[in-house]
């Protein structure tokens, strides 16, 4: 092909040689006077050729080198080229403007010859898919590089004998402009599937923005060509498309005469291998929708989206964009498109095009789209959401066209539902089965023709759908049989829906409700119920059809039949995202799931959704049908299919890897976590996971109900006007766990209908591997552990490798989990604590956190809450808290936050409580004393326990005194012992210090202990200490720590000890005063010495000379000694002070030059101004005095 263009203002004929499929026709218009620029497919620089009829070089069908930047074949000088497409001589512009491009009656800009028929009818369907998206988006995800470097369409009118294929080999294999020449911006909320570009080195998340181009390079050419493509005319026939103001009138007279495809041409297309493509049930109109409004490619021509509402029908969902790009560079194998059925999608009332499905098609679903429901545009980001208003707050998420094309537009064929926008209720979590061979992320569109799609789109999951997991993950024989059996008699009976396992979420202030309570609490009409059973119906029909599929937990945020996302913002946090069940082996689904789905189908089909309301108030009312024994379905490539999950088809009640909550797989139960009358959790999902030795404490994946869905009659977490019912009541019956001989799902006789079926909190940060067998609480290794409240904190990090939600697990992703109210959140905290931390319980009381005292005590905010409450708590409330923390008191003592709770009990608790805690400390005094937080508990205990217990506690440190004294934590305990305990009981400490006084006095921690001994011990105990101090006074006064001990003796010691120290200082005042540490000692000597000793020290300074100057002058200039001089001025006798002043006067002028001398002058001025003494020249304030 060739296109006349201007290359650097010179007319040339641009020819491409990148495709080996192109045929060179002699009738191609070529100006012999124009040089030919020949580009090769391998990236060579453009070379001028002398003649236009020269044969095209056979370019290789090469893909770009991964390490190269941009696309192979891009020239560095291409950014300097201006292109001008020349029209045919007989052609006139239809509308003018950048996006006008109308048609001439005699000319078609769409190629009419077979010279671009590139495939020769031999290319496989997957290659056509690639080529189609290449034509649409230049191999760049969502128009990443929608800048043309090659010709798009022939401008001539060639022979019309061949079929009108639209696929070239790789149109933009050699893009003239790469990503580096133009800035690319990322629109807000635009997300795509990773790896969606042909070229591995392209910016995956880049989307070409109308404003992102700086020079408008090549944009007009693209817009000119695309706006005149048949897609433009085709869109106009359907009542929508680009509505440029300057082209509307010009197109009015041409609409009826312009047909994009003739009937015979369309037939040729179908005969030649269905070159048109269909993706996800959506028509792709010639690969490009040139709606300029949606994505204007000219800088400054970014039109507003005011016309979008006009382009859409009143009931249309504008979320459907163009076909999604395939995600690999090479062609996909044909096996990826197996198990698919072709569909017929009417593009127009007069045109029918058969299209092959892509790999994410919905099998067997005919989705007709009338002329008003065709795609709106390629880059229509603004019209891809529909706002629905509910009484509750709704979070409406904007999704891109690439994400939303997995929904089916089945709303046109669902007039019997008539779902109003205000009638939607978010679906609870259900397990759905996707149809075989289709997108494993969908929740099964088998019921799309009845209720609309119950779809979980791909953006919730990050796993690759192709061949990663076994294709047959359900044992659906039993479920399908039960569904077929019960479908007939549930069609018209409203009572059949009494046990419907569908939990409708109510208002923002309520927990999930059963249909009965939902009807009581708010108005429930058939529309609400129909929306609620939407996903269940899809699941039921999928099982009834016997189609194996991927198990998917549909989220509380759901997609209605129009594809819009509806989220109940009033739901409790942590409940909004889906959980995908992807097990390495088959997962068992109970029959009640299928029965619930069939019941939902019957309720919706007959409009009897109001009959969903049951007559009882229990949390769940499962369908009363017998549970057949599901059998594992064999799969050839599944290595685990040969080993049954039942362990010889029998659940051993004593085995740690057996059923989760039951003894037998088919043991009758009153109700079992909402699964069915005889289908306990162990018989459904638990037994399947039992083979791993794991427990599913948080993951009952029932068909239509959540395990933690509570009724209005349940007292758990139900806030009344006065208080909150203790959380541990339903779990532990006080403080002990009920060891029922039956499964947990079977309520005990003492448990009312409102008793929670939720197991106790699991014991790891992500739901540990603890199994609940026979009511006992065990971890994954089979060791029975404490079931007391708060025990989960002790084993929070003890989850085994086989934990269901552990990071090494392959069944669940911990980041996608949703927990019950009492379960451990991803942060490791219970929901009660999480809610308290989020200020949802501003008036929480101590009695309301019963069962969670340990957990609260180990939390920063919870511990502070308990501390504040304990100060003013009643004795009964203190005892309530004490009973829970006593057994794990040591654990709290060494906890960063829990230790404060223990301290509060030593401070405010009763004597019995203090003694009980002191008993817990016995035997652990040394370890606690050396621990950062335990040492604080020991210190508090020493302050408040009786002397007998004090003596017992202190005696445990005997033999470890020096170790504690030199420890950063233990030294505080020793100091507290010296302060609080009777000195007679501390003789072992004095004995331990013998010969170690100097070493300890120069120790950062030991010096503190020495000072405490000097303060509190008996004189005969301190004498040996002081003797050692006097022997090392000269060294200690100059030590960074020892000087504090000497100062302490000078301040608090006996006069004779002070005199000994002063005697050591005399004669060395000048030297020691200039020492950083000794200067402090000299100050204390001047301050605390007797009058005689003080006078001697001051006189030494005044009479002593330091070289040519006096010692006083030297000291006044020194950074340390000047403080000694100031202290001397303060404490000297009046006569001696006058002598000092006269000694200082000759040096006043010089002192003004020194920083520390100014301190002396300030002291003098302050002193004499206070006393009114005239110092002559001193009275004039020197400059810089501070």
From Swiss-Prot:
PTM-bearing positions, type Phosphothreonine: 112, 514
Mutagenesis / variant outcome for changing residue 1047 to E: Changes the specificity for RNA
Domain PUM-HD: 828-1168
One family name in Pfam for this protein: PUF
Residue stretches of each Pumilio repeat: 848-883, 884-919, 920-955, 956-991, 992-1027, 1028-1063, 1064-1099, 1103-1142
Region (Non-specific-nucleotide binding in RNA target): 971-975
Low complexity bias locations: 45-58, 485-502, 626-639, 763-773
The protein's assembly and partners: Recruits the CCR4-POP2-NOT deadenylase leading to translational inhibition and mRNA degradation. In case of viral infection, interacts with DHX58. Interacts with TRIM71 (via NHL repeats) in an RNA-dependent manner.
Clinical disorder: Spinocerebellar ataxia 47: A form of spinocerebellar ataxia, a clinically and genetically heterogeneous group of cerebellar disorders. Patients show progressive incoordination of gait and often poor coordination of hands, speech and eye movements, due to degeneration of the cerebellum with variable involvement of the brainstem and spinal cord. SCA47 is an autosomal dominant disease with a highly variable phenotype and incomplete penetrance. Clinical features include developmental disability, ataxia, and seizures. Neurodevelopmental disorder with motor abnormalities, seizures, and facial dysmorphism: An autosomal dominant disorder characterized by global developmental delay, impaired intellectual development, early-onset seizures, poor overall growth, delayed walking, hypotonia and/or ataxia, and facial dysmorphism. Some patients have hypoplasia of the corpus callosum and cerebral atrophy.
Protein name as it appears in the record: Pumilio homolog 1
């Amino acid at each position: 092909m060739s296109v006349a263009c201007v290359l650097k203002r010179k007319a040339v004929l641009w020819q491409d040689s990148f495709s080996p499929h192109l045929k060179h026709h002699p009738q191609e218009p070529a100006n012999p006077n124009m040089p030919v620029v020949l580009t090769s497919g391998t990236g060579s620089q453009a070379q001028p050729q002398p003649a236009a009829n020269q044969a095209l070089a056979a370019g290789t069908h090469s893909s770009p080198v991964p390490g190269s930047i941009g696309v192979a074949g891009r020239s560095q000088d291409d950014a300097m080229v201006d292109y001008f497409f020349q029209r045919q001589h007989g052609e006139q512009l239809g509308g003018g403007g950048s996006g006008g491009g109308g048609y001439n009656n005699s000319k078609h800009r769409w190629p009419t010859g077979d010279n671009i028929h590139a495939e020769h009818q031999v290319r496989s369907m997957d290659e056509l898919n690639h080529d189609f998206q290449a034509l649409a988006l230049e191999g760049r995800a969502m128009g990443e590089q929608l800048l043309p470097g090659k010709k798009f369409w022939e401008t001539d009118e060639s022979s019309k004998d061949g079929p009108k294929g639209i696929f070239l080999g790789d149109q933009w294999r050699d893009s003239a402009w790469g990503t580096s020449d133009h800035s690319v911006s990322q629109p807000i909320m635009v997300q795509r599937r990773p790896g969606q570009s042909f070229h591995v080195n392209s910016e995956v998340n880049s989307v070409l923005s109308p404003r992102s181009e700086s020079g408008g390079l090549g944009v007009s050419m693209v817009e000119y060509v695309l706006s005149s493509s048949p897609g433009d005319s085709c869109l106009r026939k359907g009542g929508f498309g680009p509505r440029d103001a300057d082209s509307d009138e010009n197109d009015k007279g041409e609409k009826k005469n312009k047909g994009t495809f003739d009937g015979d041409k369309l037939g040729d297309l179908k005969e030649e291998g269905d070159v048109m493509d269909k993706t996800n049930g959506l028509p792709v109109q010639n690969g490009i929708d040139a709606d300029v409004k949606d994505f204007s490619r000219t800088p400054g021509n970014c039109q507003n989206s005011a016309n979008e509402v006009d382009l859409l029908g009143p009931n249309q969902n504008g979320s459907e964009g163009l076909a999604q790009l395939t995600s690999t560079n090479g062609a996909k194998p044909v096996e990826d498109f197996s198990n698919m059925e072709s569909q017929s999608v009417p593009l127009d009332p007069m045109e029918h095009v058969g299209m092959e499905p892509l790999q994410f098609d919905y099998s067997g679903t005919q989705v007709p789209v009338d002329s008003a429901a065709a795609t709106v545009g390629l880059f229509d980001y603004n019209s891809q959401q529909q706002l629905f208003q509910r009484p509750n707050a709704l979070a409406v998420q904007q999704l891109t066209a690439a994400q939303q094309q997995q929904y089916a537009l089945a709303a046109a064929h669902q007039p019997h539902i008539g779902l109003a926008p205000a009638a939607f209720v978010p679906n609870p979590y259900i397990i759905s089965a996707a149809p075989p061979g289709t997108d494993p992320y969908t929740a099964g569109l088998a019921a799309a023709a009845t209720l609309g799609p119950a779809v979980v789109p791909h953006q919730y999951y990050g796993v690759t759908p192709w061949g990663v997991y076994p294709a047959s993950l359900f044992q659906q024989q039993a479920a399908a049989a039960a569904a077929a059996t019960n479908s007939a008699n549930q069609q018209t009976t409203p009572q059949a829906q009494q046990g419907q396992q569908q939990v409708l979420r109510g208002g923002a202030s309520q927990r999930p409700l059963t249909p009965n309570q939902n009807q009581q609490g708010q108005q429930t009409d058939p529309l609400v119920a129909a929306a609620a059973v939407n996903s269940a119906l899809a699941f039921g029909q999928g099982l009834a059809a016997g189609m194996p599929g991927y198990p998917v937990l549909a989220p509380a945020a759901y997609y209605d039949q129009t594809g819009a996302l509806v989220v109940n913002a009033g739901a409790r946090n942590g409940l909004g995202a889906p959980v995908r069940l992807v097990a390495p082996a088959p997962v068992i689904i109970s029959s009640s799931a299928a029965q619930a789905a069939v019941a939902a189908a019957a309720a919706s089909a007959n409009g009897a959704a109001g009959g969903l309301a049951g007559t009882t108030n229990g949390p769940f009312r499962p369908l009363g049908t017998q549970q057949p024994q599901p059998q594992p379905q064999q799969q050839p490539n599944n290595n685990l299919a040969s080993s049954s999950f039942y362990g010889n088809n029998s659940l051993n009640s004593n085995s740690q890897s057996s059923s989760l909550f039951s003894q037998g797989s088919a043991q009758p139960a009153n109700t079992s976590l909402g699964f069915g009358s005889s289908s306990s959790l162990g018989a459904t999902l638990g037994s399947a996971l039992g083979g791993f030795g794991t427990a599913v404490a948080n993951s009952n994946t029932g068909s239509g109900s959540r395990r933690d869905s509570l009724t209005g009659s349940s007292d758990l977490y139900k806030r009344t006007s006065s208080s909150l019912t203790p959380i541990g009541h339903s779990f532990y019956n006080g403080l002990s766990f009920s060891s029922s001989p039956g499964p947990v799902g079977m309520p005990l006789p003492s448990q009312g209908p409102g008793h929670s079926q939720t197991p106790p909190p699991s014991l790891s940060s992500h739901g540990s591997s603890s199994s609940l067998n026979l009511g006992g609480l065990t971890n994954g290794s089979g060791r029975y552990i404490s079931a007391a409240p708060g025990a989960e904190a002790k084993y929070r990090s003890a989850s085994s490798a086989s934990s269901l939600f552990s990071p090494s697990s392959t069944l669940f992703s911990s980041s996608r989990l949703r927990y019950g109210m009492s379960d451990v959140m991803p942060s490791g905290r219970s929901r009660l604590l999480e809610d308290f931390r989020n200020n949802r319980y501003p008036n929480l009381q101590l009695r309301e956190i019963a069962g969670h005292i340990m957990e609260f005590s180990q939390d920063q905010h919870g511990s502070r809450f308990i501390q504040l409450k304990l100060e003013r708590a009643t004795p009964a409330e203190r005892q309530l808290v004490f009973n829970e923390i006593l057994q794990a008191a040591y654990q709290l003592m060494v906890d960063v936050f829990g230790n404060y709770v223990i301290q509060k009990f030593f401070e405010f608790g009763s004597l019995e409580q203090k003694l009980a805690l002191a008993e817990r400390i016995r035997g652990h005094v040394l370890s606690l004393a050396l621990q950062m937080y335990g040492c604080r508990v020991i210190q508090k205990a020493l302050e408040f326990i009786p002397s007998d217990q004090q003596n017992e506690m202190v005696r445990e440190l005997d033999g470890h005194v020096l170790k504690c004294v030199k420890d950063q934590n233990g030294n505080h305990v020793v100091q507290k012992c010296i302060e609080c305990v009777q000195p007679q009981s501390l003789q072992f400490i004095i004995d331990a210090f013998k010969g170690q006084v100097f070493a300890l006095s120069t120790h950062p921690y030991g010096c503190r202990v020495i000072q405490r001994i000097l303060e509190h011990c008996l004189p005969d105990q301190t004498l040996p200490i002081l003797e050692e101090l006097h022997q090392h006074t000269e060294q200690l006064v100059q030590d960074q720590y020892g000087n504090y001990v000497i100062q302490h003796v000078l301040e608090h010691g006996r006069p004779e000890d002070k005199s000994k120290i002063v005697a050591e200082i005399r004669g060395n005042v000048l030297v020691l005063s200039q020492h950083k540490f000794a200067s402090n000692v000299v100050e204390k000597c001047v301050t605390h010495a007797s009058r005689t000793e003080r006078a001697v020290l001051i006189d030494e300074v005044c009479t002593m000379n330091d070289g040519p100057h006096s010692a006083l002058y030297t000291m006044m200039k020194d950074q340390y000694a000047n403080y000694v001089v100031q202290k001397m001025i303060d404490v000297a006798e009046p006569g001696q002070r006058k002598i000092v002043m006269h000694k200082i006067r000759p040096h006043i002028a010089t002192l003004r030059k020194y920083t520390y001398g100014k301190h002396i002058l300030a002291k003098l001025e302050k002193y004499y101004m206070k006393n009114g003494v005239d110092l002559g020249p001193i009275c004039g304030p020197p400059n810089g005095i501070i």
